[in-house]
Amino acid sequence: MKKVEIKKKTIKELNIELMNLLREQFNLTLQHSAKKLQQSHLLQHVRRNIAQVNTILAEKEKECD
């Protein structure tokens, strides 16, 4: 996901996106631990997306204060 796309979203949408990413990370971690994950790089992508969403979310919350 591009940063421009993330910045256009509202705080509510960002929270929903964050929950979806965390759920996806959990599922990928389970698959990885069971040795069923063929594309282990997906974990890194999801982790990066979580960090980006958290950063933008913090910026938007700071703006509201």
UniProtKB/Swiss-Prot annotation:
It holds the Pfam family Ribosomal_L29. The keyword Nucleus does not apply. Keywords: Ribonucleoprotein, Ribosomal protein. InterPro entries: Ribosomal_protein_uL29 (IPR050063), Ribosomal_uL29 (IPR001854), Ribosomal_uL29_sf (IPR036049). GO terms for cellular component: cytosolic large ribosomal subunit. GO terms for molecular function: structural constituent of ribosome. One of its GO terms (biological process) is translation. NCBIfam families: L29 (TIGR00012). Belongs to the universal ribosomal protein uL29 family. This is Large ribosomal subunit protein uL29.
